[in-house]
Amino acid sequence: MTQLHFDNRLRQQLPGYQEEGARRREVRAAWSAVMPTPVAAPYLIAHSAEMAHVLGLDASEVASAAFAQVFGGNALYPGMQPWAVNYGGHQFGHWAGQLGDGRAISLGEAIGIDGGRYELQLKGAGPTPYSRGADGRAVLRSSIREFLCSESMHHLGVPTTRALSLVGTGDAVVRDMFYDGRPQREPGAIVCRVAPSFIRFGNFELPSARGDNALLRQWVDFTIARDFPELVGTAEALYADWFAQVCQRTAVMVAHWMRVGFVHGVMNTDNMSILGLTIDYGPYGWVDDYDPDWTPNTTDAQGRRYRFGTQPQVAYWNLGRLAQAVAPLFADQAPLQQGLNRFRDTYLACDRRDTAAKLGLAECRDEDLELIDALRALMRDAEMDMTLTFRGLIDLSPVHPDPAQLHDAFYDDHKRVASASQLQEWLQRYAARLQQDALSPDERRALMRLANPRYVLRNYLAQQAIDQAEQGDPSGVQELLEVMRRPYDDQSGRAAFAARRPEWARDRAGCSMLSCSS
């Protein structure tokens, strides 16, 4: 039997409801005890060997029937004390009231072999007191997407929650994928998500909205003590340092999203991690042909609130809602504005750093921001693939820049021909800038390879793996996981995983637009 060590500080140190199973319309506590609902026949589809190692789980344990039972929701390891957390949130700009973990159940806080804290959370393990009448289950397609994206983002260097395992349940789940009145039975699955903390902005918003300043203060004090132990001080000064840290981490996270072309799709405040981690992988996507107005979320198709280009502004707005929530703990609101300013300053610094790295420059001058903006405008107008364009610049000659280097980045031959002179003009500007730069050609290429991935988890790649898995073949999931472990390396025999989106996937469900149905 695996001997994981759990201390479960959240459950021990914050007020909650101990009795299991009851569904409540309104919960005035931080958490509620709840047991996963057993499934028919749990079986392991895929797992992260790296995450298992950090937790101290060896290969034989992961391959055991007991592992599938535990992470399929049918059993517990000693020390696990399952709970679901209570929170609220702003959804699409409007206060939604109490939400909570509707289908996420935390098993416990494990201490890894590295001394780190790892909360293990099952998504899709059945109803909780916060399910609001839903079944608390998840389908295979959404579970595959969450599992793969969690690990892919980690290896891209983007702050993120992780995934330990993907377990099939042997049960069917009924879902209306596009909310069009045509529900279908789909295979069920459960992902075990892993993070130092799953605390969200909404954990602070809910007690604040209810005027429960005592619980609000408990949440803040607990979060600082457990998750920000490096912060020292007392009273408002400590709270101000903490809020500024949250703002800074959020800025770093979003800057990475913009660097790799990731679109979260549903940046509600209940989907914002207090640690600045990417959390809740639902209708996400990667930008294929560059379009700052693109969103993968069908629910957001009309308003496009969460489109790619507005993600930094949305993050700032969300931090403003967090500032409002914790304002009762401050006599003076100035420290909160200073924290919001930290977000702005950090994001701008990250943007300059990433601009230099993506273009292979020793430093980012003001005119370099204009240079990359001109490239983005060209990519948008000429329908060029973001990932392939930046990757294609790596081997460009600063002496004789050849537009053919970017041939594969175009989705439309007519637009490629029409934009040829603009592209040549931009390449000449870029080549001239490279000749002024202090980096050697080898240094430039090395820098660019670490900033511009060769492989990203394009929606069509994930959908192909889903199609296979739904037919009983998990090999596509496992191969994608392996490819995405080294996203910056040129991998022999895997050129197909770096190809631009094929035409058949342009408008196919799951490849272009996705819903929140999962």
From Swiss-Prot:
It comes from Xanthomonas oryzae pv. oryzae (strain PXO99A). HAMAP family: YdiU_SelO. Its cofactor is Mg(2+); Mn(2+). Mg(2+) binds at N271, D280. It holds the Pfam family SelO. ATP binds at G100, G102, R103, K123, D135, G136, R193, R200, D280. It catalyses: L-seryl-[protein] + ATP = 3-O-(5'-adenylyl)-L-seryl-[protein] + diphosphate; L-threonyl-[protein] + ATP = 3-O-(5'-adenylyl)-L-threonyl-[protein] + diphosphate; L-tyrosyl-[protein] + ATP = O-(5'-adenylyl)-L-tyrosyl-[protein] + diphosphate; L-histidyl-[protein] + UTP = N(tele)-(5'-uridylyl)-L-histidyl-[protein] + diphosphate. Belongs to the SELO family. Nucleotidyltransferase involved in the post-translational modification of proteins. It can catalyze the addition of adenosine monophosphate (AMP) or uridine monophosphate (UMP) to a protein, resulting in modifications known as AMPylation and UMPylation. Its EC number is 2.7.7.-, 2.7.7.108. Keywords: ATP-binding, Magnesium, Manganese, Metal-binding, Nucleotide-binding, Nucleotidyltransferase, Transferase. It comes from the Bacteria. The keyword Iron does not apply. This is Protein nucleotidyltransferase YdiU.
